[in-house]
Amino acid sequence: MVLLSILRILLLWGLVLFMEHRVQMTQVGQPSIAHLPEAPTLPLIQELLEEAPGKQQRKPRILGHPLRYMLELYQRSADASGHPRENRTIGATMVRLVRPLASVARPLRGSWHIQTLDFPLRPNRVAYQLVRATVVYRHQLHLTHSHLSCHVEPWVQKSPTNHFPSSGRGSSKPSLLPKAWTEMDIMEHVGQKLWNHKGRRVLRLRFVCQQPRGSEVREFWWHGTSSLDTVFLLLYFNDTQSVQKTKPLPKGLKEFTEKDPSLLLRRARQAGSIASEVPGPSREHDGPESNLCSLHPFQVSFQQLGWDHWIIAPHLYTPNYCKGVCPRVLHYGLNSPNHAIIQNLVNELVDQSVPQPSCVPYKYVPISILLIEANGSILYKEYEGMIAQSCTCR
């Protein structure tokens, strides 16, 4: 049974990876893996698979400040096992770091140096609401023999300068940035002009730098500065899907299930002799207490699963599993649904061909994952229902 549970977990994760690959490769115009079988569109599996690149795609070489920023964000928001911290302050369940496409630099014009940056925006997903958008950039560039003072502004054709509104500057969130960097809120600009548009969307910004008076910045020094490491976009999302919770048992049924088991079974057998002309043999006991339904720890590394080419953190995943025999009387502490309680009575009294309730996870906790998407973006995301925390019979 343990091996079967493990194989089920690995199969589900395999389906997750496959479906995510198909969605991502379709969006970037690459073919999917032809030799993999078709997979069912289970909601959680489909959601996770929408983030991962194909296995044949090597992890993009993402170094420098974007990766350092997201690693620090992850460490502040989750522990080493991936459990979200209770005191996390990012105010979102998903953060996507988007790097610009290849930039276009204008010819030098006196002391001004301008680069046009395009940030591709993925299609909207109904399940996620954009709650914050910021641009992070270096406001001081230290080049050989000189330095530049820089800022980011919205791109407007034939406009020398067009600053964001002063109210959008700065950030009220705790900063993860060194002193040479600035994070600026551009939610109003993104939300009004781009986010609700259909089709391909690109956020175009200008990275404008000015050299001090009396200094000279040679053109080859400027072109040696990579905008991929000096400017990036951060998009913050919240999951809008409601999590369905198990309803508590009615008061009468709760009292019914908490009565003395022997008395309850005697009454049940009496009812069974009326309900069934040929009742089957009853179970005399539930077995040793160690065999009862309970939570068992289980851990696997993403490297073992072959997913370390796109998952940055954590390195280990502890899904856990439930195993054991469900007792004859499902007491209230097991949090079993009404259907399972009735099913157990039917198995005991009426027809043993009706299976007993199974030992399955009841409560889950999320896991935070930092990963690289197919297009090279870095994603922090909290996935619900990934770690079993308690068990029930149903």
From Swiss-Prot:
According to the record, glycans are attached at 87, 238, 375
Which segments does the entry list as coiled coil? none
Q: Name one GO molecular function term.
A: cytokine activity
InterPro entries with a match to the protein in the record: Cystine-knot_cytokine, TGF-b_C, TGF-beta-rel, TGFb_CS
One Gene Ontology term, aspect cellular component? extracellular space
Q: Which residues form the propeptide?
A: 19-269
Instruction: Give the matching Gene3D superfamilies.
Output: Cystine-knot cytokines
Q: List the disulfide bonds.
A: 293-359, 322-391, 326-393
An example of a Pfam family matching this protein is: TGF_beta
Q: According to its UniProt record, where is this protein located?
A: Secreted
**Key words, A-Z:** Cytokine, Disulfide bond, Glycoprotein, Growth factor, Secreted, Signal
The record's listing under SMART domains reads: TGFB
Leader sequence residues: 1-18
Q: Which family does it belong to?
A: Belongs to the TGF-beta family.
Functionally, this protein is described as follows:
May be involved in follicular development. Seems to be an oocyte-specific growth/differentiation factor that stimulates folliculogenesis and granulosa cell (GC) growth.
Q: What does the subunit section of this Swiss-Prot or TrEMBL entry state?
A: Homodimer or heterodimer (Potential). But, in contrast to other members of this family, cannot be disulfide-linked.
Q: Mind telling me what this protein is named?
A: Bone morphogenetic protein 15
Q: Which organism is it from?
A: Bos taurus
